[in-house]
Regions:
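Conserved N-terminal beta-strand and adjoining loop/helix that marks the start
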Residues: 1-19, 39
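Conserved Nudix-box catalytic region and its N-terminal flanking loop in Nudix hydrolases
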Residues: 17-56
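HhH-family (HhH-GPD) DNA N-glycosylase catalytic core used in base-excision repair
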Residues: 55, 61, 130-132
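Active-site-adjacent beta-strand/loop module that shapes the phosphate/pyrophosphate-binding cleft
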Residues: 61-62, 70-94, 102-108, 120, ...
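A generic structural signal for short hydrophobic patches within well-formed alpha-helices
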Residues: 111-112, 124
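Charged phosphate-binding loop/patch that engages nucleotide di/tri-phosphates or the phosphate backbone
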Residues: 119-136
């Protein structure tokens, strides 16, 4: 059996909007949109990894709220797990610091106006269902 490496993604929500991040690197992912996040380090809880990754990538203080049902395979040995998250009071506004060049808050009706990374689409669909919007 192969060990899997968990990648955490944040469905960062604010006033019914979802934060999407446009990749700037690596070149094969640049220009596509994703849920921000990253790899869980050995010995780290996924929720702690999510908080750390959001601070590193977006400069924010956020907290995981609830795990989104599902687990989505990425390039082996990685697997994506997603949590809803929110900004903590007093947090700075998100800004692209690492691996991204643009951020966008998407309302439910605009969720599919950006070209999501294929690997993130199933997770975004699940988040969309939780927001009460039509899946695509």
């Amino acid at each position: 059996m192969t060990d899997r490496t968990v990648v955490v993604g944040a469905a960062l929500l604010d006033a019914g909007r979802l934060l999407a991040a446009r990749r700037s690197a690596p070149p094969e992912l640049a220009g596509r949109w994703e849920l921000p996040g990253g790899k869980v380090e050995p010995g780290e809880r996924p929720e702690d990894a999510l908080t750390r990754e959001l601070a590193e990538e977006l400069g924010i203080d956020a907290e995981p709220v609830e795990r989104v049902p599902g687990e989505w395979p990425l390039k082996s040995p990685y697997v994506l797990r997603v949590w809803t998250a929110r900004l903590r009071p007093g947090s700075a506004a998100p800004r692209p610091l690492q691996d991204h060049d643009e951020l966008r808050w998407l309302t439910p009706e605009r969720l599919w106006e950006v070209p999501w990374l294929e690997q993130d689409v199933p997770a975004v669909r699940e988040v969309a269902a939780r927001l009460g919007t039509g899946a695509r």
